[in-house]
Amino acid sequence: MRAILMGPPGAGKGTQAADLITRYQIPHISTGDMFRAAIKAGTALGMKAKEYMDAGSLVPDEVTIGIVAERLAEPDCSKGFLLDGFPRTVAQADALDKILTQLKMNLDGVINIEVPEAKLLERLTGRRICRQCGGTYHMVFNPPAAEAVCDKCGGELYQRSDDTLETAKNRLQVYNDQTQPLIDYYREKGLLKEINGDQDIAQVLQDIVDAMEHGHD
């Protein structure tokens, strides 16, 4: 299976990626992991990426695309792969098409996990952390017995600044603005598999497997 995994923050991509790579015995390729591996290996492109990252700059497309090309050419990708976090733009998607053509590979599908915005915001803003012991709770999935009090030590629970409603809304807006053209691009190519992420984890996985193996959207 050669696939791209897409979905907004809070859609549960990480959980699905872990299950898919185990099921299909394929590598999970995320841009962050690729950059780290290329830097560790000391490749020319890895060193170039490190310069930008150390300066706090975005790594330019030609470097990112070069690192992706090197990674997909490795033997463990011959039976398939799950790309996560790449491509992010239509320009990167075009470049990926060229890479796959050179490697004589076809993309089997683009999995897009969809969850209503209200649910995403609930997931993204629900986390609470204990100031004393660092214990983590979620107001929906794993709530404390008493609101704002840690079950373990009685410490005060607080919400991190990057878990606030305003921050979460901004993250979703940035994601939607950036990826909508990409979703349209893959829909036009007939590769987009739209998956309902607002159901239990096992059902989401089953829907992905059905869509990839039987071609149902």
Swiss-Prot record:
<keyword id="KW-0479">Metal-binding</keyword>
<feature type="binding site">
    <location>
        <position position="127"/>
    </location>
    <ligand>
        <name>ATP</name>
    </ligand>
</feature>
<feature type="binding site">
    <location>
        <position position="153"/>
    </location>
    <ligand>
        <name>Zn(2+)</name>
    </ligand>
</feature>
<protein>
    <recommendedName>
        <fullName>Adenylate kinase</fullName>
        <ecNumber>2.7.4.3</ecNumber>
    </recommendedName>
</protein>
<comment type="subunit">
    <text>Monomer.</text>
</comment>
<dbReference type="Pfam" id="PF05191">
    <property type="entry name" value="ADK_lid"/>
</dbReference>
<feature type="binding site">
    <location>
        <position position="36"/>
    </location>
    <ligand>
        <name>AMP</name>
    </ligand>
</feature>
<feature type="binding site">
    <location>
        <position position="150"/>
    </location>
    <ligand>
        <name>Zn(2+)</name>
    </ligand>
</feature>
<keyword id="KW-0067">ATP-binding</keyword>
<dbReference type="GO" id="GO:0044209">
    <property type="term" value="P:AMP salvage"/>
</dbReference>
<feature type="binding site">
    <location>
        <begin position="10"/>
        <end position="15"/>
    </location>
    <ligand>
        <name>ATP</name>
    </ligand>
</feature>
<comment type="pathway">
    <text>Purine metabolism; AMP biosynthesis via salvage pathway; AMP from ADP: step 1/1.</text>
</comment>
<keyword id="KW-0545">Nucleotide biosynthesis</keyword>
<keyword id="KW-0418">Kinase</keyword>
<dbReference type="InterPro" id="IPR006259">
    <property type="entry name" value="Adenyl_kin_sub"/>
</dbReference>
<keyword id="KW-0547">Nucleotide-binding</keyword>
<feature type="binding site">
    <location>
        <position position="133"/>
    </location>
    <ligand>
        <name>Zn(2+)</name>
    </ligand>
</feature>
<feature type="binding site">
    <location>
        <position position="160"/>
    </location>
    <ligand>
        <name>AMP</name>
    </ligand>
</feature>
<keyword id="KW-0862">Zinc</keyword>
<keyword id="KW-0963">Cytoplasm</keyword>
<dbReference type="GO" id="GO:0004017">
    <property type="term" value="F:adenylate kinase activity"/>
</dbReference>
<feature type="binding site">
    <location>
        <position position="130"/>
    </location>
    <ligand>
        <name>Zn(2+)</name>
    </ligand>
</feature>
<feature type="binding site">
    <location>
        <begin position="57"/>
        <end position="59"/>
    </location>
    <ligand>
        <name>AMP</name>
    </ligand>
</feature>
<feature type="binding site">
    <location>
        <position position="92"/>
    </location>
    <ligand>
        <name>AMP</name>
    </ligand>
</feature>
<dbReference type="GO" id="GO:0005524">
    <property type="term" value="F:ATP binding"/>
</dbReference>
<dbReference type="InterPro" id="IPR033690">
    <property type="entry name" value="Adenylat_kinase_CS"/>
</dbReference>
<feature type="binding site">
    <location>
        <position position="171"/>
    </location>
    <ligand>
        <name>AMP</name>
    </ligand>
</feature>
<feature type="binding site">
    <location>
        <position position="31"/>
    </location>
    <ligand>
        <name>AMP</name>
    </ligand>
</feature>
<dbReference type="GO" id="GO:0008270">
    <property type="term" value="F:zinc ion binding"/>
</dbReference>
<dbReference type="InterPro" id="IPR027417">
    <property type="entry name" value="P-loop_NTPase"/>
</dbReference>
<dbReference type="InterPro" id="IPR000850">
    <property type="entry name" value="Adenylat/UMP-CMP_kin"/>
</dbReference>
<comment type="similarity">
    <text>Belongs to the adenylate kinase family.</text>
</comment>
<feature type="binding site">
    <location>
        <position position="199"/>
    </location>
    <ligand>
        <name>ATP</name>
    </ligand>
</feature>
<keyword id="KW-0808">Transferase</keyword>
<dbReference type="InterPro" id="IPR007862">
    <property type="entry name" value="Adenylate_kinase_lid-dom"/>
</dbReference>
<dbReference type="Pfam" id="PF00406">
    <property type="entry name" value="ADK"/>
</dbReference>
<feature type="region of interest" description="NMP">
    <location>
        <begin position="30"/>
        <end position="59"/>
    </location>
</feature>
<feature type="binding site">
    <location>
        <begin position="85"/>
        <end position="88"/>
    </location>
    <ligand>
        <name>AMP</name>
    </ligand>
</feature>
<feature type="binding site">
    <location>
        <begin position="136"/>
        <end position="137"/>
    </location>
    <ligand>
        <name>ATP</name>
    </ligand>
</feature>
<feature type="region of interest" description="LID">
    <location>
        <begin position="126"/>
        <end position="163"/>
    </location>
</feature>
<comment type="function">
    <text>Catalyzes the reversible transfer of the terminal phosphate group between ATP and AMP. Plays an important role in cellular energy homeostasis and in adenine nucleotide metabolism.</text>
</comment>
<dbReference type="GO" id="GO:0005737">
    <property type="term" value="C:cytoplasm"/>
</dbReference>
